[in-house]
């Protein structure tokens, strides 16, 4: 269920289940028009699965110490630029992840805090450019991982395909890449201290949030990150 953060806090005080995932949609750079469609897709996930309570937050300032104590995952959904949480809030988030929290970055999340390398180190890479936009093939390079289990060996999707400042293979385990002669990872996971980090570069257009392969990837990536069944 997606609800405003303040309402979720009231429900929590009333004894309702705590939110498991805080979905941040704040942008300080480019604002993706697909964010509402992506948020709606996560809403359906929360409605259809008893494993997730998903709470949307418009501002990263909502990631207070108290909010993080009650959360199992933080999702940066196409966030961009230097978010309002600032360096103090970022350090708090990084400590929480290293202590065992789950972090999921989707699409433009890799273009967040571009001047703060500690964020890119946690995520696995920093966005550089999107040299190809259109219908492309994604090759699933590891189908044994819980996030990709059940996906086909490859699939075609209309999307914006990223390349990164450094190859994420240096810091992460790559799960999928673009089908091209160059090595262009798109999906990966890594450990940050005791925390789990999952990232997918897919999700630029609205249509990506209706694509069954992308939806399965996001759901299973979140399940893995929070250690859900």
Question: At which residue positions do the language-model features occur?
Answer:
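Extracytoplasmic/secreted envelope proteins and their assembly/folding machinery
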Residues: 39-43, 90-94, 116
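Extracellular ligand-binding/catalytic regions of CAZymes and related secreted enzymes
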Residues: 7, 18-19, 25, 33-36, ...
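Solvent-exposed loop/turn segments at secondary-structure junctions
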Residues: 27-30, 60-62, 79-83, 103, ...
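Bacterial Sec-dependent signal peptides at the C-terminal "C-region" and cleavage site
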Residues: 3-20, 30
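A short beta-strand-loop structural module common to alpha/beta enzyme folds
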Residues: 51-61
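Short alpha-beta junction capping motif
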Residues: 21-24, 68-113, 194
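An acidic, glycine-rich "communication" segment
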Residues: 106-181
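Solvent-exposed, acidic/flexible segments
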Residues: 28-35, 83-90, 211
């Amino acid at each position: 269920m997606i609800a405003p953060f303040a309402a979720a806090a009231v429900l929590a005080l009333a004894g309702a289940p705590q939110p498991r995932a805080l979905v941040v949609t704040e942008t300080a750079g480019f604002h993706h028009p697909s964010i509402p469609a992506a948020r709606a897709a996560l809403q359906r996930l929360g409605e259809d699965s008893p494993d997730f309570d998903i709470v949307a937050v418009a501002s990263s300032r909502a990631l207070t110490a108290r909010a993080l104590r009650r959360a199992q995952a933080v999702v940066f959904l196409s966030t961009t630029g230097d978010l309002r949480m600032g360096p103090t809030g970022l350090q708090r988030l990084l400590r929480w992840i290293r202590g065992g929290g789950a972090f999921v970055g989707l699409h433009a999340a890799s273009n967040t805090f571009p001047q703060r390398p500690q964020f890119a180190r946690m995520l696995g890479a920093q966005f550089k450019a999107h040299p190809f936009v259109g219908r492309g093939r994604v090759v699933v390079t590891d189908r044994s991982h819980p996030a990709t289990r059940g996906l086909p060996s490859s699939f075609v999707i209309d999307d914006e395909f990223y390349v990164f400042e450094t190859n994420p293979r240096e810091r992460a385990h790559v799960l999928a890449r673009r089908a091209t002669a160059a090595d262009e990872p798109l999906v990966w996971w890594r450990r940050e201290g005791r925390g789990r980090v999952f990232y997918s570069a897919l999700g630029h257009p609205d249509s990506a949030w209706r694509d069954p392969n992308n939806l399965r990837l996001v759901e299973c990536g979140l399940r893995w990150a929070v250690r859900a069944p």
